Amino acid sequence: MNETEATLPVFTLEQVAEHHSPDDCWMAIHGKVYDLTPYVPNHPGPAGMMLVWCGQESTEAWETKSYGEPHSSLAARLLQRYLIGTLEEIT
């Protein structure tokens, strides 16, 4: 975790789960929480592909795009724009 991330709010998976619609879409990916609501209408793939992961731990979807292909480095840079916090570690 870098210095900037250390100052971000920490969310539980239950809090992420409250944001599960096209108008309120949060995802947890690799221990970080992203509010992807503004990006939903701009997603280049089918909207439904992204929406099924709203409100969830979505690392698997990020890594495979649901069909075995990783996201591009451009997508990884774009994702950082939507970072809002970190996911609480479960011990």
From Swiss-Prot:
Gene3D superfamilies: Cytochrome b5-like heme/steroid binding domain. Keywords: Disulfide bond, Electron transport, Heme, Iron, Metal-binding, Transport. SMART domains: Cyt-b5. One of its GO terms (molecular function) is heme binding. InterPro entries: Cyt_B5-like_heme/steroid-bd, Cyt_B5-like_heme/steroid_sf, Cytochrome_b5. Disulfide bonds join 25-54. The keyword Transcription does not apply. One of its GO terms (cellular component) is intracellular membrane-bounded organelle. Residues 8-88 form the Cytochrome b5 heme-binding domain. Heme binds at residues 43, 71. Belongs to the cytochrome b5 family. This is Soluble cytochrome b558.
